[in-house]
Structure formats: structure tokens, C-alpha cells
A protein has these predicted regions:
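Cys-dependent protein tyrosine phosphatase-like superfamily
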Residues: 2-109, 123-161
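A phosphate-binding catalytic loop at a beta-strand-loop-alpha-helix junction
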Residues: 109-119
């Protein structure tokens, strides 16, 4: 069991090393989050996360350079994937890369500015595997409205048949 508490705003309790962030569980092996700070990476690893997926482009306001994140992940013993998704620029390579990252060590934590783009990549990777209702419900329970990507999900689900 991961020692994680969910909060409205990311905070850290360094005295007990208990991670308290806005982590949202999508599956037993995947949580998504808004921007993760460098010190959080080691805490995530100590909390049990094995893979870190960064969906935030370096040039986005407030983003931490992906090379610094990669080093923090390596120092913490985590697998790291940099899959930057700019709003509205979803590609088959990003969807595939996200799915491949999820096949790595588990559990994984994926982040972007709000967690929405990470959730979108997960959802699109589930097209044809889970029902549309299951995907939308899972995202909704985590606080994300994916109605805008339903047409793409349907297209991908049809292509996977």
C-alpha cells in the first residue's frame, strides 16, 4: 500500500516523509498529478512509485526542465519517460509511448500542468481495451472531463478492431 494522502494543494511533510499531494488514482498501477517538484520525486519513489512519466513540455510556464526531472528520477531509482504533450497536439507516438511506459515498473505516476493531459493519454491508450463509459467514468472520478476527446477515442477504438 502506498503511503499517499490526497490534498487540494500539493504539500510535503518532510519530517515524516509522508507524501501529501494532489495525486489522483486512475488504476491500481497509475496515478496522475499536477506538476511535481524535484524534491517530490524521491518522496514518490520512497512511497512506492517505480515509474515517472512527464507530459509537460519544457517551455511551458512553470515546467521543470525534463533533464533535471530525469536526473531526480534516476537518483531515486525510478524509470523515467519524457512524453511532452502540448495542448491539442496529440500524436500516435505519444499515445503509444505512454502505453509503453505503463508496461514498465509499476506503479507509475504521470504529470503535466493539471494532470488532464496525462489522463487523456491514458484514456486514448485504453481505446478498444476498456469501454468508453469505463474510461470516461474513471477520468471523471479522478476529476477530469474527457468529453472533448470522445471522438478521437471512438476513432482509435474502431481502428483497433
Amino acid at each position: 500500500m502506498l503511503d499517499i494522502a490526497v490534498a487540494d494543494a500539493p504539500i510535503r511533510d518532510y519530517a515524516t516523509e509522508r507524501l501529501v499531494m494532489d495525486l489522483r488514482q486512475l488504476t491500481p498501477n497509475l496515478a496522475v498529478s499536477p506538476q511535481i517538484d524535484l524534491p517530490d520525486v524521491a518522496l514518490l519513489a520512497r512511497s512506492g512509485f517505480k515509474t515517472l512519466i512527464n507530459n509537460r513540455p519544457d517551455d511551458e510556464d512553470g515546467a521543470i526542465d525534463h533533464q533535471l526531472m530525469a536526473q531526480a528520477a534516476a537518483d531515486a531509482g525510478m524509470e523515467y519517460h519524457y512524453l511532452p504533450l502540448r495542448p491539442g497536439q496529440i500524436t500516435p507516438d505519444l499515445i503509444h509511448g505512454f502505453s509503453v511506459a505503463l508496461d514498465g515498473p509499476k506503479p507509475a505516476i504521470a504529470f503535466c500542468r493539471s494532470g488532464n493531459r496525462s489522463t487523456v493519454l491514458w484514456a486514448l491508450g485504453q481505446a478498444g481495451k476498456l469501454s468508453e463509459a469505463e474510461v470516461l467514468n474513471t477520468a471523471s472520478q479522478a476529476g477530469y472531463d474527457l468529453s472533448g476527446v470522445v471522438p478521437l477515442m471512438r476513432s482509435l477504438a474502431g481502428a483497433s478492431r
